[in-house]
Every structure is written in C-alpha cells, then in structure tokens.
Amino acid sequence: WIIPGLWDCHTHFTQWSYTLGRLDLIEARSAHEAMDMLRGHVSQLRSEGRLDPNRYVVGMRFRHSLWADDEQPTLAAIDAVAGDQPVALSSADMHCGWVNSAAARKLGVQVGESGLVGELEWFDAYCRLDDAPGAAEELDRLLREAEHDAAGKGVVGIRDYEMAENINTWTGRFANGINGLRVQAGVYPERLHQAID
C-alpha cells in the first residue's frame, strides 16, 4: 500500500451521493448563470424523455451569498425557466432553498419575491423531496456511485452527519449491499432517544 485508507470525518453522505446525479450549480456566479444552467438541464431532461411533472427537478450547491446584489434569486426568474415543472434548488451549505411556485405548492412552503425558503423550513422541505416518486430508487443508485467515488479517492470510512436516523439508515443500507465503507453514524440530540432504543 502507499498510504493508509482515508476517513472523511464530517460528511453528509446522502448529499455527497446527490451531487453525482443532480444539477450542480457550484460554478454559477449569478442568479442569471444559475438559471441558464437550469434551463439547459431541463431541456436535456425533456429531450431524454425524463422530465416528469410529478417529480422534482433538483439542483444543488448554489452560492447566492457570493453573488452581486442585483444578481440574487427571484421567484420570477425561476418560474420563467421552470414553468409548471416543480424545481427545488438547495444552497451549497444546505441552509436555504430556491424553489419555483410549482415546487412551493407541492412542498407546502411559502415563498416571497425571492423564491427562497429559509433554513428551518428548508430542512423540513428538503427532506420531503426524498418522499417524491422515484426518489428512493434514485438515491439507491447514487449511493452506490458515491461509494465507488469514495473508494476511488482512497476513502475507506466516513463519519456521516445526515439529519436522519443514521443508525437505522446505515443498518438498512448495509443489508442492501451498500457496505463498502466503514461508517460512524452521527446522532443529533433530538434523535438520541431513537439511537438508544
């Protein structure tokens, strides 16, 4: 061997997985660029026959805090690009979301002119994306890709801080053959009683 196996001691492995299959907006330097990227993504999904009005188009990792004041998210901009197709975009730090009107209705969130959903409401809304049609199958496929991606980087173990029942989640994943990493499952205080039981 060349070096010991690496550990990622603070990851959100589900989110890592999603970056491999969802629209990545990390390179967008403005709301305009993010919407250009979204427009291209929606167009590609449509041309491949994968655009379903009952499923969310999800994007990740926009950084609006780095954008100029006149290049901030707006509900009008995302509605103009997405129309009736539900679209939910998560910020890079996961502390807010940018949704269009169709997604806001489906998720049951209120948005103003910015189209942004604040931190606590976004945490709950983002979790509801996992209940959408086809989401479980997508996640299973992406988890396997992420496990392979981690191995390719020399990562043999992770400490997972997803906001979920991580012990039960990982027990189920291991049972389903997603077992190529050593996992230390983080537990948030509000879920401690579930971990103890």
Each model region followed by its residue ranges:
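Divalent metal-binding segments
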Residues: 1-197
